[in-house]
Each structure stands twice: as structure tokens, then as C-alpha cells.
């Protein structure tokens, strides 16, 4: 993966910020007896921070409407759409090749230039999907609906993941069939030297940010192995 844009580190910082206190206050103030909305509230805070950071840096944050229950936000930097997922969910999507997941659809329409760069061979099932024109057309049409007017301004999609256990933020690259290509760990940064960039919220517990010597870091980025290759939860 070529040198990453500096702005992505700002999004790594807001993506890894904990909103536990904010969410607990919502439950407490409303005297909720259950916490069914916890995952949704967590992502609402994350997407708010992503949108605010995009606005503060004059970047576009597309809204991807997936129906009544879920809307995702990403950010376009230099023609690349970065979407945000928890690491375990990302691994599930590419392991199982969830054919109609939004990541699968957008990757199918935007990442064909990366085909052939994967390390592993295609599974028989995935190989059969290569010849499924109906599926491919369906995925591309879905991608066009999700991205709307932003579709033609996007050249590639990458996935920024957050590992809840290790607190690591990683930028992942996949081909058109969501086969893993490359990953760069962007966690090791000093929060004290990152500008707030006009975000309206104050982070409760920032975990990553930009070091003063970030340019050196960018020029020799640390590549990581296949994200699901060594996961501890495999098979559980």
C-alpha cells in the first residue's frame, strides 16, 4: 500500500475514542432497564465524530443508507473512500464473503484494479462467483445506490478497522472480491500533538493520534499480516 494521507490519522484518533461515559449517561438519564441500543449508540457517536472531522478538514463524508435500521458514514480522501468497521466484523465479512454487504458491493465496483495482488488462491465457491454476471451487476448497482452522486468520484475503497481487544487501528486493502491484499497499522501515535481540528465533541479517552515525526512513519509504514490469520477467536 502506498503512503497513506496524513488526514487518515485524524480519523484513526476519533474512531478509537471511547464514548462509554456518554452512553452510560444516556441510559442513566432515561432509566433504561435494557441496553439493546448500545451498539447503535456506539456507532452514532463514531459517525458523528467522522462527519465533524471531515467537515473540519474540508473532506467529503458520504452517507450510505442501508435501509431503515442502519446508515454508515465514510470519508473520501484523494479519491479513496475509507469506511470504518470493527475488526471482527470486517473479518467475518471477508471470511464468509457476504455477497450483499455494503463493503462487498462497493469493493466489487471499485477495487478490480487490485485483483491478482492477493496472496491466497480463490476458494471454489468464490471462484464460481467470478463468472456470476448477475451477482456482479447486482453488487455494482447496489454500490451506485449507496454512494449516489459520490460514485464517480471514488477510485478505490479501503477499510479502517478497530480491534476492541488490542485497541489497534488498521487500514486494510482488499480486491474486488474482498480478498485481503495489505494492511497498515496506524495506531502508534502521540495524541498530545494532534490538533482538535474543530471537532464539536471532546473525546473521553483518545487512544491514537499523530506523532511529530509522522512523516517518517508514513514513509516506512508497518505492514501487518492477514488480519484473520492469527486471530485468537478463530473458530469460536
Predicted segments with their positions:
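Interdomain/boundary linker segments immediately adjacent to catalytic/signaling cores
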Residues: 1-41
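Non-membrane alpha-helical secondary structure
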Residues: 3-7, 15, 42, 135, ...
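Nuclease catalytic cores
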Residues: 39, 43, 47, 88
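Short, solvent-exposed secondary-structure boundary motifs
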Residues: 52-53, 63, 147-151
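Glycine-rich, aromatic-bearing surface loops/beta-hairpins
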Residues: 143-236
Amino acid at each position: 500500500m502506498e503512503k497513506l494521507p496524513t488526514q487518515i490519522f485524524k480519523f484513526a484518533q476519533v474512531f478509537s475514542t471511547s464514548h462509554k461515559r456518554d452512553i452510560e449517561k444516556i441510559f442513566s438519564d432515561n432509566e433504561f432497564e435494557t441496553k439493546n441500543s448500545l451498539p447503535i449508540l456506539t456507532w452514532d457517536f463514531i459517525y458523528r465524530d467522522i462527519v465533524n472531522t471531515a467537515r473540519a478538514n474540508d473532506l467529503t463524508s458520504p452517507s450510505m443508507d442501508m435501509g431503515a435500521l442502519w446508515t454508515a458514514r465514510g470519508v473520501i480522501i484523494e479519491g479513496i473512500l475509507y469506511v470504518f468497521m470493527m475488526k471482527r466484523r470486517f473479518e467475518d465479512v471477508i471470511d464468509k464473503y457476504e455477497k450483499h454487504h455494503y463493503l462487498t458491493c462497493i469493493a466489487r465496483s471499485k477495487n478490480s484494479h487490485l485483483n491478482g495482488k492477493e496472496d491466497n488462491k480463490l476458494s471454489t465457491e468464490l471462484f464460481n462467483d467470478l463468472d456470476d454476471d448477475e451477482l456482479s451487476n447486482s453488487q455494482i448497482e447496489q454500490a451506485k445506490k449507496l454512494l449516489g452522486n459520490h460514485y464517480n468520484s471514488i477510485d478505490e475503497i479501503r477499510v479502517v478497522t478497530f480491534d476492541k481487544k488490542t485497541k489497534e487501528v488498521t487500514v486494510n486493502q482488499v480486491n474486488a472480491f474482498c480478498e485481503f491484499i495489505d494492511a497498515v497499522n496506524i495506531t502508534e501515535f502521540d495524541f498530545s500533538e494532534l490538533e482538535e481540528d474543530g471537532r464539536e465533541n471532546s473525546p473521553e479517552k483518545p487512544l491514537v493520534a499523530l506523532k511529530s515525526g509522522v512523516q517518517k512513519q508514513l514513509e516506512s509504514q508497518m505492514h501487518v499480516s492477514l488480519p484473520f490469520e492469527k486471530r485468537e477467536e478463530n473458530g469460536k
